[in-house]
Amino acid sequence: INSEHCRHKIFGGTFVIDGVEQESSLFQMIKKTTQENPNKIISAYKDNVAFAEGPVIEQFAPADQSKSDYFQIKDVKSVISLKAETHNFPTTVEPFNGASTGTGGEIRDRMGGGKGSWPIAGTAVYMTSYPRTEEGRPWEEILPVRKWLYQTPEQILIKASNGASDFGNKFGQPLICGSVLTF
């Protein structure tokens, strides 16, 4: 099956606005922003991770890292890795493990991009239909309740958050912030 899981057929497909087919896909338009205005972007859309210029930081490390040497403090130009991992279908089917392995893919891609990087923190964003956690919310009554094929929105929001943070914590990348959008 050729799913939307990693291929992003929607972003790479034909993009139509008001019945007019656009010359670029949505993904091509997103890439064009970085091409025309790179600002501090060092690398993007390669290795499944982007790198941007970071601040100058103090590093406490061996003077010569190729051999045993004394430690010193020195200023180092840093590079920040930026990564988003979509794991929509796996998280819908099994939220804890789907989001957990999404975090794993994000960590893997950061560590494997360019010369590699050191993941230090993660974020997560969850978007679902109304979770209907309580009765009597008028905004949720606009749409009829439906049967869910895999998990309910409430199950996804709770279990996916637990899975993403569990995996990140085990690999030294705590989940430090996130966002929830229900509609």
What is each of the regions a protein language model found here?
Residues 1-183:
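Long, structured ligand/cofactor-binding scaffold of large enzymes
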